[in-house]
Design a protein with these regions (language model features):
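A charge-rich, low-complexity, intrinsically flexible signal that marks solvent-exposed coils, linkers
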Residues: 5-6, 10
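Secretory-pathway/luminal and periplasmic proteins that interact with or process carbohydrate-rich
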Residues: 4, 26, 44-48
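An active-site-proximal "capping" alpha-helix that borders the catalytic cofactor pocket
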Residues: 11-24
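Active-site-adjacent "gating/activation" loops or surface patches in catalytic cores
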Residues: 1
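Short helix/loop segments within enzyme catalytic domains
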Residues: 23-37
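Non-catalytic terminal regions of proteins
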Residues: 36-225
Length: 225
C-alpha cells in the first residue's frame, strides 16, 4: 500500500499544490485575500540548501511542463535549437499543457518524472545548486551549478527512497567474526555521526566489532566501532 505513495511523493504533493493554487487564486479567494494566501503557501513550498521539498519541486515542474507544451517547446526542432533568443521567444501556441499534465500524472513516478522533465532550462530558471557539507563547520555550502551534478544529486536522493545503499562485504572479517559493511558511494558522503551511531547499535546486536567502508571527502575511509 505504502510503496506507490513513496514512489510518487513529489508528483502527489506537487499535483495537490498545483490544483490548490489554481483553485484558490482563480475561484475561491477575493482580491484582498490573495496576499495572505500567498504568504501561507510560500511557507509550504520553501526549500533550504540541500533540501528536496516535494511540494516546491513538484508544483514548479508541473508548471514548467504545462508552459512547454502550451508553447510547443518539445520535439526535434526544439531540442535542436541552439539560438538563445529563439528559445526564449519560442511559442507555437499549441495549448497542449493540460493534456500533457494528465498524461505525465498517469504514466510517471518520481524518478522518471525528474529524469525526463528536469531540464537544464528548468534547473537554471529555478536557480538550483549542488551543496556539500563543510566538515569543519558542519554547514552545507554551495559546491557548484553543474546541471549534470545537480540532476544526479537529485535523482540520487530518490534512489532507495533517499537511504544509502549499505551491503555486507564480509560477515567474518579478518577471520575474527567481525562484520564488515560496504557503502555504495554514488556521489553523496554519509553523515559521519549518523554512521557511527548506526555502527554502535549494530555492534550491540552483532556482539563483535563492526566496520564500514565508505568514501569521505573523496578519500577511502573505514569507520569502526
Amino acid at each position: 500500500y505504502f510503496l506507490p505513495q513513496r514512489q510518487t511523493k513529489i508528483m502527489n504533493e506537487g499535483w495537490a499544490t498545483y490544483w490548490h493554487s489554481k483553485i484558490m487564486t482563480t475561484r475561491a479567494l477575493r482580491d484582498d485575500e490573495i496576499i495572505d494566501y500567498a504568504d501561507a503557501a510560500s511557507g509550504v513550498t520553501a526549500m533550504g540548501p540541500g533540501q528536496l521539498n516535494p511540494y516546491k519541486i513538484g508544483v514548479e515542474l508541473y508548471r514548467h511542463i504545462e508552459e512547454r507544451w502550451n508553447r510547443g517547446q518539445f520535439g526535434k526542432d526544439w531540442e535542436g535549437c541552439t539560438d538563445l533568443h529563439e528559445r526564449l521567444t519560442w511559442d507555437k501556441k499549441l495549448g497542449l499543457g493540460k493534456q500533457k499534465l494528465f498524461e505525465v500524472r498517469r504514466l510517471h513516478n518520481d524518478v522518471t518524472f525528474l529524469d525526463e522533465f528536469f531540464t537544464e532550462d528548468f534547473c537554471r530558471d529555478q536557480k538550483f545548486f549542488t551543496f556539500k557539507e563543510n566538515r569543519r563547520t558542519g554547514r552545507l555550502e554551495i559546491e557548484g551549478r553543474s546541471f549534470a551534478k545537480i540532476k544526479a544529486q537529485m535523482l540520487q536522493q530518490l534512489s532507495n527512497f533517499g537511504q544509502p545503499f549499505i551491503f555486507v562485504a564480509d560477515a567474518n572479517y579478518l577471520n575474527r567474526g567481525e562484520l564488515l559493511l560496504g557503502h555504495r558511494h554514488e556521489g553523496g558522503d554519509l553523515k559521519a555521526d549518523y554512521a557511527r551511531d548506526t555502527l554502535r547499535s549494530l555492534e550491540r546486536v552483532w556482539r563483535r566489532p563492526v566496520s564500514l567502508l565508505t568514501i569521505l571527502d573523496d578519500k577511502p575511509k573505514r569507520i569502526r566501532f
